[in-house]
UniProtKB/Swiss-Prot annotation:
Ca(2+) binds at D12, D138, I139. One of its GO terms (biological process) is tRNA splicing, via endonucleolytic cleavage and ligation. InterPro entries: Archease (IPR002804), Archease_arc (IPR022952), Archease_dom (IPR023572), Archease_dom_sf (IPR036820). It comes from Sulfolobus acidocaldarius (strain ATCC 33909 / DSM 639 / JCM 8929 / NBRC 15157 / NCIMB 11770). Activates the tRNA-splicing ligase complex by facilitating the enzymatic turnover of catalytic subunit RtcB. Acts by promoting the guanylylation of RtcB, a key intermediate step in tRNA ligation. Can also alter the NTP specificity of RtcB such that ATP, dGTP or ITP is used efficiently. This is Protein archease. It comes from the Archaea. Belongs to the archease family. Transmembrane segments: none annotated. Keywords: Calcium, Metal-binding, tRNA processing.
């Protein structure tokens, strides 16, 4: 299964992430965001970051998850290439781990910096056992 794909969007980047579970789709979404910024296959898992979020709904939970990861890039230049997520739908909470390392210009390709997550065109759906997350990030 393809984990994610990009779609054209004026001045920003659209992402469609897939997963066999909601958690896997959230992990794919995070991977796609960091793939916009660098080649994630070059990221070593030297640092582990734990993230806990509470959302008002699934869209808000996705927004908070991606935005939290971007804060680590903005503040510490951390790039992530592996993620583990668990979601409690009853309490609308997310517990996640992100694995990666600090950006190194000699090792990591510098692509487009993602400035922020948005709600623009956000859609979370399920089709034939596949969860689909569609959203746009600001670049």
């Amino acid at each position: 299964m393809t984990r994610f794909e990009f779609f054209d969007h004026t001045a920003d980047i659209g992402i469609i992430a897939y997963g066999r579970s909601l958690e896997e789709a959230f992990e794919s979404a995070a991977l796609a965001v960091f793939e916009v910024m660098t080649d994630t296959s070059k990221i070593e898992y030297k640092v582990e970051v734990e993230i806990e979020e509470i959302g008002s709904d699934l869209e808000n939970l996705l927004y908070r998850w991606i935005e939290s990861l971007l804060v680590y890039y903005d503040s510490d230049l951390l790039l992530f290439g592996k993620f583990k997520v668990s979601i409690d739908l009853n309490n609308m909470t997310l517990k996640g781990k992100a694995y990666g390392e600090k950006f190194n210009p000699e090792k990591h390709e510098r692509r487009t910096v993602v400035k922020a997550m948005t709600y623009h065109e956000m859609l979370i759906s399920q089709n034939d056992g596949t969860y689909i997350l569609r959203f746009v990030v600001d670049i």
